[in-house]
């Protein structure tokens, strides 16, 4: 009996293998056409756009497009409900994110485009600022000078004032000599007045006396 049963099992296995091979060989050749692509569940073009958060579309259209893709069974219905909830929440999040952006009309584009440059960078080589600051420095260095009563105005100062009065333009002006000024006969003026020179001499003599007095005391000792 055991040998007969084993023989039947072998025949059944052979028959099953033969049937499987026949089905495989007799089935029609499957190509990459619409029939083959329809076997896969994929998102349509409309569903892809709605998932990106295109505003102005109705939520019922998103539900309808997602319902066409899923199968009509309970498990797929549950998947569909989760999918529609995700689409709604994602679109709401995108709407809130867009609302946080500022309108271009509210921004002053001229202020952001124009670089904040200091006035010093706009000066050409050799130019001087026209607005001279008149503020007093916080720290003035002390220089031992004799008391002065009068200060004579110098002609060079007048010439500098005339040059500063000229309007500086963007074009570089060529250097030219003043035809009215006699460069050969220039009157040299002293930096100090005669009274100031006398005071300086007196101070020098006093300083020499102070320096020589300790030496004399040492020699006497």
UniProtKB/Swiss-Prot annotation:
GO MF terms held by the record: intraciliary transport particle A binding
GO biological process, one term: spermatogenesis
Alphabetical keyword list: Phosphoprotein
Pfam family, one: IFTAP
GO cellular component terms attached to this protein's record: 9+0 non-motile cilium; cytosol
SS bond list: none
Xref: InterPro entries: IFTAP (IPR040028)
Phosphoserine PTM positions: 59
Biological role: Seems to play a role in ciliary BBSome localization, maybe through interaction with IFT-A complex.
Complex and partners: Interacts with IFT122; the interaction associates IFTAP with IFT-A complex.
Protein name as it appears in the record: Intraflagellar transport-associated protein
Organism: Homo sapiens (Human)
Lineage of the organism: Eukaryota, Metazoa, Chordata, Craniata, Vertebrata
């Amino acid at each position: 009996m055991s040998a007969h049963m084993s023989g039947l099992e072998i025949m059944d296995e052979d028959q099953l293998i033969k049937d499987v091979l026949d089905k495989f060989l007799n089935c029609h050749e499957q190509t990459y056409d619409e029939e083959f692509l329809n076997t896969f569940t994929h998102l349509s073009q409309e569903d892809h756009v709605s998932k990106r958060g295109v505003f102005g579309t109705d939520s019922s259209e998103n539900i309808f497009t997602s319902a066409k893709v899923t199968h009509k069974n309970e498990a797929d219905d549950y998947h569909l409900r989760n999918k529609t909830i995700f689409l709604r929440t994602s679109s709401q999040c995108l709407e809130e994110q867009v609302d946080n952006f500022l309108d271009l009309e509210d921004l002053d584009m001229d202020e952001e485009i124009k670089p904040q440059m200091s006035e010093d960078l706009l000066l050409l080589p050799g130019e001087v600022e026209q607005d001279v600051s008149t503020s007093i420095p916080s720290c003035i260095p002390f220089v031992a000078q004799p008391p002065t009563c009068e200060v004579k105005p110098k002609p060079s100062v007048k010439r500098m004032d005339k040059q500063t009065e000229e309007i500086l333009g963007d074009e570089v002006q060529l250097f030219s000599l003043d035809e009215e000024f006699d460069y050969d006969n220039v009157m040299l003026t002293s930096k100090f007045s005669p009274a100031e020179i006398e005071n300086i001499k007196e101070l020098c003599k006093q300083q020499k006396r102070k320096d020589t007095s300790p030496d004399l005391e040492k020699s006497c000792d």
